[in-house]
Amino acid sequence: MFLRHCITFTLIALLAGCAGFGSREALQGHGDPQQWRAHKEQLSSLDGWQINGKVGIRAPRDSGSGTLFWLQRQDYYDIRLAGPLGRGAARLTGRPGGVVLEVANQGRYEATSPEALLEEQLGWQLPVSHLVWWVRGLPAPDSKSKLTLDGDSRLASLDQDGWQVQYLSYTEQNGYWLPERLKLHGKDLDVTLVVKDWQPRQLGH
């Protein structure tokens, strides 16, 4: 079950391509809206990164923790998860139009999109496209969001499409302030992500 939830977390993490920011944000909190807009614009230019960290899963019938490696190069991604004590591993690679999921001792699965793969393999429908934004400390641009800014005009929390994301700490890397520890609360699923190493890149188009 833990591996299944890890796969879910991985699939939520994927969106290939970028979209522009609209006026779908409801802002509150202590931050300055102008500073937030500048911060958001800077982070939106990031189209590549490498993350090493830990992920924790809490669900009604299962919980556990594992390690996370996430390589993003524009619209290509390579995400690897390893369960506790080496109990299972999963790797998801792809770009728009083709996704491959490899699960240790189980097999290799393909689909045209991460959303399709999630539904085919797990029977679940979840907002697959959002975490690539959330992990940078940004709301996904394609739906309404409620944002709370901290005193530094960065996200303290956001509510979007039935999920709540709390930003507990940030780290500065190469001039970017990026989330270091965040918690995601969804229906019957809580995810904690701790980033041990952020390597952001602006690759260009």
Swiss-Prot record:
Protein name: Outer-membrane lipoprotein LolB
Lipidation (N-palmitoyl cysteine): C18
Cellular compartments annotated: Cell outer membrane
Keywords: Cell outer membrane, Chaperone, Lipoprotein, Membrane, Palmitate, Protein transport, Signal, Transport
Upper lineage: Bacteria, Pseudomonadati, Pseudomonadota, Gammaproteobacteria, Pseudomonadales
Lipid attachment site numbers (S-diacylglycerol cysteine): C18
Presence of keyword Transcription regulation: no
The encoding gene: lolB
Membrane topology reported for the UniProt record: Lipid-anchor
Subunit (UniProt): Monomer.
Cystine pairings recorded for this chain: none
Listed GO CC annotations: cell outer membrane
Membership in a protein family: Belongs to the LolB family.
InterPro entries named in the record: LolA/LolB/LppX (IPR029046), OM_lipoprot_LolB (IPR004565)
Signal peptide per UniProt: 1-17
Primary role: Plays a critical role in the incorporation of lipoproteins in the outer membrane after they are released by the LolA protein.
Species this chain originates from: Pseudomonas putida (strain GB-1)
GO biological process: lipoprotein localization to outer membrane; protein transport
Pfam families xref list: LolB
